[in-house]
């Protein structure tokens, strides 16, 4: 396994040298407004000392081709940085600055050199077209007019909320301040780019280095482990299937963890030990992995129990009889939810 690590400013990452994509087995974009606003605030403070670089952690990439890479760690930051650059671009009045900022998030293409126009960063399949159309290609006005019903995933809702907040925060700066911010972002914000040609090796590196980003949730761990037990040809299909099942449960990590804790109890009749990830893997998921039947777990266990959980969580959204809905709504008013 060949590993290469090099430190680069952001302006040398968002270039034709790195065509980045988020694999389908990765978790969704989960940053909230407070996360992106904190990043903007940190960068505003840092750019007051332009001679001092701002280190934004590492990216772990798997090389898929000469300039094509899958992102194993760094998705949340890369998406958020793209949002910030898109907001800066749309706030800009100078055409040259607009062109330069736009080229950071969308490769403009070069027919002479055979370079096609495409986004620098491609999200997971379910969110890629949305992110490209509204953020990367500069349709922020249309994005700001959207509401939750216009979104097909929690990631898209997070993209809308974070883009609005980033735009409003950067709009508070005058033109000179935004130019100084953008210049610092491109030239002084640095990342350590760790590349390897081996997916398993990339995950081992991630396990060692994942200290800066948001911690993985149990659902993230279970999904990644489940995908590892599928044939390569089935990974994209079942990664999308997993997302279709879990996305309606929301992205509140505590509530999703509660779902898996109760699922573990139902399937094993064992009380919680406080080690959900370890227990669920050993008591439930590993049996399906050993039997090469992860598809049976996803279709026959995860899907129906997630549907039942949604009914218990939001009975008003169901077509259950009125008296049943009323009783479930009353039960949801209790502080303790062990009845589920």
Regions found by a protein language model. Give the residues of each.
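Hydrophobic, Leu/Ile/Phe/Ala-enriched alpha-helical segments that form helix-helix packing faces
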Residues: 43-47, 92, 170, 174
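Polyanionic (Asp/Glu-rich) segments that form extended negatively charged tracts
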Residues: 122-340
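Short, amphipathic alpha-helical segments that act as regulatory/interfacial helices
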Residues: 40, 82-85, 206
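Extended charged low-complexity segments that act as oligomerization/scaffolding linkers
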Residues: 97-139
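Short alpha-helix boundary/capping and kink motifs at helix termini
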Residues: 1-72, 76, 179-180, 191-192
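Short active-site loop/helix that positions an aromatic residue
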Residues: 77-94
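Glycine-rich, histidine-containing beta strand-loop boundary motifs that form or position
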Residues: 72-75, 82-84, 101, 193-195, ...
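Secondary-structure transition/capping motifs at alpha-helix termini
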Residues: 49-51, 91-95, 212-216
């Amino acid at each position: 396994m060949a590993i290469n690590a090099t430190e680069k400013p952001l302006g040398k990452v968002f270039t034709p040298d790195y065509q980045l994509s988020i694999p389908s087995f990765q978790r969704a974009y989960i940053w909230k407004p407070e996360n992106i606003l904190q990043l903007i605030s940190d960068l505003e403070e840092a750019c007051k000392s332009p001679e001092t670089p701002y280190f934004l952690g590492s990216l772990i990439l798997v090389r898929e081709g000469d300039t094509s890479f899958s992102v194993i760690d760094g998705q949340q930051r890369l998406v958020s940085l793209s949002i910030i650059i898109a907001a800066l671009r749309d706030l800009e009045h100078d055409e040259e600055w607009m062109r330069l900022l736009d080229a950071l998030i969308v490769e403009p293409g070069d027919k002479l050199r055979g370079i096609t126009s495409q986004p620098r960063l491609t999200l997971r399949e379910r969110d890629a077209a949305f992110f490209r159309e509204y953020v990367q290609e500069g349709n922020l006005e249309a994005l700001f007019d959207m509401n939750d019903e216009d979104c097909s995933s929690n990631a898209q809702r997070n993209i809308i909320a974070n883009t609005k907040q980033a735009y409003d925060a950067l709009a508070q700066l005058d033109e000179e301040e935004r130019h100084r911010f953008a210049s610092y972002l491109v030239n002084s914000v640095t990342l350590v780019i760790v590349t390897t040609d081996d997916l398993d090796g990339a995950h081992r590196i991630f396990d060692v280095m994942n200290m800066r980003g948001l911690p993985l949730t149990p659902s993230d761990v279970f999904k990644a482990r489940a995908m590892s037990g599928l044939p390569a040809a089935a990974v994209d299909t079942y990664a999308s299937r997993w997302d279709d099942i879990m996305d309606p449960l929301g992205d509140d990590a505590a509530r999703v963890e509660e779902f898996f804790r109760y699922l573990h109890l139902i399937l094993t009749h064992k009380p919680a030990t406080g080690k959900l990830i370890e227990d669920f893997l050993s008591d439930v998921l590993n049996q399906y992995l050993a039997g090469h039947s992860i598809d049976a777990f996803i279709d026959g266990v995860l899907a129906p129990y997630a549907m039942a959980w949604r009914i218990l969580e939001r009975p008003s959204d169901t077509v259950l009889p009125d008296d049943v809905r009323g009783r479930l709504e009353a039960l949801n008013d209790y502080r303790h939810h062990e009845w589920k």
